[in-house]
């Protein structure tokens, strides 16, 4: 079923398609997303609570493991996660809202696949992840870069402070690419996806997305991004307000919000989330930009929310607002400002080791009963303590007058 869909999506991505057809396919995929299987983890949870008292004593770790099992089931072999970095430039960078020049996006993409010396590479190696990099809209030539998906919908979005960031067809194309990638990765056996992004000025786009969908003022969603100055922060806030006033995105239409104020890499991450939900994969969000993409994904496909986990709360002002709208509790508070699947790598490592430990607890019935017996021996006394008139003699005799 997924193989047929992947072939169709591949054809669509290489042909000029009518926007209505693209939207019909996205809608069909969303309709096929199933609720997570709570029964798949229920029996596991009951046994775990028996073996590791008190009930739910493992806290967030237990919740992480149960969410994964309800999505993917108990794995015969747990594959490593996929660290997927989506790259694109943003036309709004012309408004001077970032501390870095736009060509930084190309330089970082080159670093990912040539010298492999970025934080994204280091954390992917740490979690033993499969690393993928995609050019959705870098304003520069990446044809000679190895190990990169050359998608390039356009060399950067348009300046959303002046006009819509992209056409609706371009927005749908970015979504479909992400959907296709999630389906393809599931066919290869991967079930934990860690989206990251690189795109100078993309926190400006994310601030506009969060303000639009969460229905809050831009003051609450606009942060310092790459640690910009107070003066530039005020400029950035004014630009976010201008983006929203110019384009008037419809908060109920995720594709419209993406079209008006989004980015190609954010659309691809939103698509990855929808495709993961369709394919029963877990997506662990990283920072604010991935949360903004999740807002788009869940506006288009509300049932995809059950397939998302929030790794951490970062340093951007809009991050907690986006997570609250998504109904997600972050696992950690890290104040990370990089968006290269760093926080999500740490969460994935915690999940994978937690899952392995929980499976190990249940591995042997002999060990299980021995453990329960030991706990009962410690916690249940053979008889209650008997108090006599001698019980407090030591204390009364040694007390100072």
Go through each PLM region and give its residues:
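Short, Lys/Arg-enriched N-terminal segments with co-localized hydrophobic residues
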Residues: 1-6
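N-terminal loops that bind phosphate or other acidic moieties
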Residues: 7-400
